[in-house]
Structure formats: C-alpha cells, structure tokens
C-alpha cells in the first residue's frame, strides 16, 4: 500500500517541495534564522511605515499621536506592539544567526564573514541612531 502523498498528483508536488526536500541531513533548525531575519525585517519596515503615517515628532504632540495610534487607528495597538516586539525578535534572530556561524565555523570563509560583521555593525548603528538616541 503506497502513501497517498507520493501518488496523488497535487500532493506529490507538495511532498517533493516540503516533505521530501532534497536537502542535506546536517540541515538543522539553526539554519532558519537567516530567513527569520528577512521576515522580521519586512515586518519592521511595514509596521514602521504604517506607524509613521500617524506619528508626529513634535515634542508637544508626540505622546498624543501615540495615544491616537493606539486608540483611534484600526489595529494601531497591534502595529505598535508588532513593531516594538519585532525589533527584539530581530536582534534575537540576529544573535542566534551569528552564534550558529560561530558554532559551525563559518568564520573560516573570511570574505563572507567580514561582510556579515559589517552588516552587523551597520544594524547596530542604525538601531542606536533610531531607537536609543531619540
């Protein structure tokens, strides 16, 4: 008796793409963090863009604009919390991604590693300028 996921025409496509993926056996859950970084970055950009549509940076009205976002904008509270927690999740994924590279010895690929370190410094500088200084 054969498995339906290997014989059904539609399930066969899904099976070959997701279940029986032609990937090495050493591929572990540590390799997800690069794609999670992309997802977190996309969420940060989108939520930041939508929050910036309603935010005013004037010192007299900044707090009122945040309360306006949370109370009057549809799902504004969700956008604000996604943006705040997405930044933390981004850095958790970033540090785990670097940790995976250290664990598996990716620092031996010096050109790729140096580009990654430059990107890490750029991300940290951007976070400092955008979140710590204001």
From Swiss-Prot:
Its BP terms in the Gene Ontology are: mitochondrial electron transport, ubiquinol to cytochrome c
Q: Which residues bind heme b b562?
A: 83
Which GO MF terms are attached to this record? Answer: metal ion binding; ubiquinol-cytochrome-c reductase activity
The residues that hold heme b b566 are: 97
Q: Name one GO cellular component term.
A: mitochondrial inner membrane
Cofactor(s) recorded in Swiss-Prot or TrEMBL: heme b
Compartment(s) where it occurs, according to its Swiss-Prot or TrEMBL record? Mitochondrion inner membrane
Cofactor note text: Binds 2 heme b groups non-covalently.
Residues annotated as transmembrane: 33-53, 77-98, 113-133
Q: List the disulfide bonds.
A: none
- Further comment: Heme 1 (or BL or b562) is low-potential and absorbs at about 562 nm, and heme 2 (or BH or b566) is high-potential and absorbs at about 566 nm.
- What is annotated about its quaternary structure and interactions? The cytochrome bc1 complex contains 11 subunits: 3 respiratory subunits (MT-CYB, CYC1 and UQCRFS1), 2 core proteins (UQCRC1 and UQCRC2) and 6 low-molecular weight proteins (UQCRH/QCR6, UQCRB/QCR7, UQCRQ/QCR8, UQCR10/QCR9, UQCR11/QCR10 and a cleavage product of UQCRFS1). This cytochrome bc1 complex then forms a dimer.
The name on file for this protein is: Cytochrome b
Record the organism. Chiroderma trinitatum (Little big-eyed bat)
Q: What is the lineage of its organism?
A: Eukaryota, Metazoa, Chordata, Craniata, Vertebrata
Gene name, per UniProt, is: MT-CYB
